[in-house]
Amino acid sequence: FANGGYKVEPGFILKVEDANGEVLFEKKEVKPSRVIDEKVAFLMNSMLSDNSARLITFGENSYLNLGSRSVAVKTGTTNDMRDNWTVGWTSDVVVGVWVGNNDNSPMKNVASGVSGAAPIWRKQMLDVLSMYPDNGFSVPEGVEEVEVDRVSGYPAHDGFAAYKEWVIGGTLPTGEDKIHQQVKVCKNDETRLANPVQVIQGNYNGKEFIVLKEDDPLTDKNLWQIGIDAWVSKQADDKYRPPTEFCESASGLDVQIISPKDRSRINSTSVEFRFEI
């Protein structure tokens, strides 16, 4: 990621000379090989350097936040708490920190990478970065910054809340945004659907709801939707729960046949009916 998608073999010893200056060993230069598309590498760097993207988990002022410096960083912890990592990088430098016991026993007072390795990583990274300018991550050709709907991920539309995001050109979803839906509801009770009579008469209000529906490509039992529904059930905002019941009976519909007239004789195999509601 730090090299824009190129893999570079690390070298710990560059050269060894004897007392007379004779070279005993010198690391051979190995040509970097591309393993990730540069556009994908940039998006990963953008996500992992975005402090707002990790607010829910780590908070605004965690050890991972280095202020104005563009630093991508990732933490990691093994399930048994034996290994604890924080690895961060810019386009100039990579710093990785491991924390653990030398006898490989589980750690008792370290909960995650952000509380174990991150404090050490932060100090080392700030010291190293003081020697480099803040060049950020270069935006490769084919990547563009666009306005994206905050809920659906579709291109921003209809004034819904949106934010700026880096994307690979041509990868944004197209077509109708089915997550934002304008539902026809009763004027006197917007928790219920307008019935067909009210819809025909135009006697309804349009109200926005967020409809979260997903198909599970892996199992017959839609585990994705089960998880979504569980999350929706905990939300206080009713916009995640579109109504399913009508507000009142549609039995009051008055329909009059205008054509053909009563007792008319029909001699054609096709008949056109006209109604007045």
Labelled PLM ranges:
Residues 1-75, 79:
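A conserved catalytic-loop motif detector
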Residues 17, 25, 29-32, 70-277:
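Soluble, non-transmembrane domains of envelope/secretory-pathway proteins that act on or interact
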